[in-house]
Amino acid sequence: QMCIRDRGNLMGVVAAISAGGAGAVFWMWLIALLGASTAFIEATLAQIYKEKDPLYGGYRGGPAYYLHVLFASRSKRQRYSLFACLFALSGLLCWCGISQVISNSVASSFENAFHIPPLYTTIFLVAIAAIIVLRKNATVKVLDIMVPIMAACYFFLTIFIIVKNAGQLPDVLSRIFSEAFGLRQAVGGGIGAAIMNGAKRGLFSNEAGSGSAPCAAAAADIDHPAKEGLFQALGVFIDTYVICTCTAMIMLLVPQELTEGLAGMDLLQAAMAYYFGEFGVVFIALILFLFSFSTFLGILFYARSNVAYLFGDNWLSQTLYKVLALVMLFIGGIAAYQFVWDLGDVGVGLMTIFNMIALFPLAPKALQALTDYEHSHKR
């Protein structure tokens, strides 16, 4: 969570500005303020209610598990809880959508950079992803080296752009706030679009409240539940106010007439081309290609605990959901841009609703854990 090895730091911000204009950035910032506390609560609860994973070792958990405790605790023989099942199913829908967003973005960026038809890029992407699934350890070692290097390069390039164009920052900030609250935008419905897209893409990027991050938080080997919650809350701030803001700035510092009418990765690559020429277009394509694999691994990990909740601890279900993810990856590469985002949005929205059903009644448990953590550090 606390890194830029994630699809949302690029794709989410680009989609927000494409659909909601500069004003969407303000609403992403606001959502992050609310999301930090939500991230703390859900990650802490994931640690409190985690359980042993007999199939892979370690621990597993997430909203499906604390929803089960909340609604099925009176009947210990009850195998399922309705809301837990609904969350797990909506999570699978969401991660199918995210798989499609990944391949769609990579295919689009490769078409811009190398003029390769989306179908060919998609086939290659799915083939590499299949190797990751089958020979995970060897591939992950390569990703662990390459992805941080590319992420650091991207971060320093964005900082370089921002520093070089520091004189334009007041105008960009003015544009962000004016498009978030301006009279012209209010009359034309632009504020509504900015709020909606800023909120949706902010949630897509930092994941706070959607219930996906707790699936990873539950597996963390940490000495106190509240400690993991605090790490997740900090991650939301770093994700949104540092990484996502950098991505937003490099797009908004470009003259508007050069990016007018562009959407998706076309917009980001046009911005990078403005600063670095053809190198910028190719660099974004390559960094997206690498990020797609780390994100895909994250999707498989998130989905694993939910599949186990729905279908039990068996290798058949654990294999089938990976095959489904590969199929979704292929469909996304050749599907329409708006379709893949709509599918992901529906899944994220449903996950958030079911997750919030648990967070409100269980929040006192997380706050008790925080109090205990504070007392333990005072002693």
What are these regions (language model features)?
Residues 83, 91, 104-110, 116-164, ...:
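Membrane-interface loop-to-helix entry segments
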Residues 18-57, 238-244, 345-358:
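Extracellular loop-to-transmembrane helix junctions
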Residues 34-42, 121-136, 147-167, 200-203, ...:
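Selective recognition of specific alpha-helical transmembrane segments in multi-pass small-molecule
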Residues 31-59, 68-104, 108-132, 286-297, ...:
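Helix-loop-helix module between adjacent transmembrane segments
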Residues 21-30, 66-69, 74-85, 222-238, ...:
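Membrane-interface alpha-helices at helix entry/exit sites of multi-pass transporters
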Residues 2-4:
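Short, small-residue-biased leader/transition segments that mark boundaries at the very start
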Residues 8-13, 22, 94-107, 129-142, ...:
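Transmembrane helix-loop junctions in multi-pass membrane proteins
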Residues 42-50, 54, 159-175, 189, ...:
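Extracellular/periplasmic helix-exit of transmembrane alpha-helices
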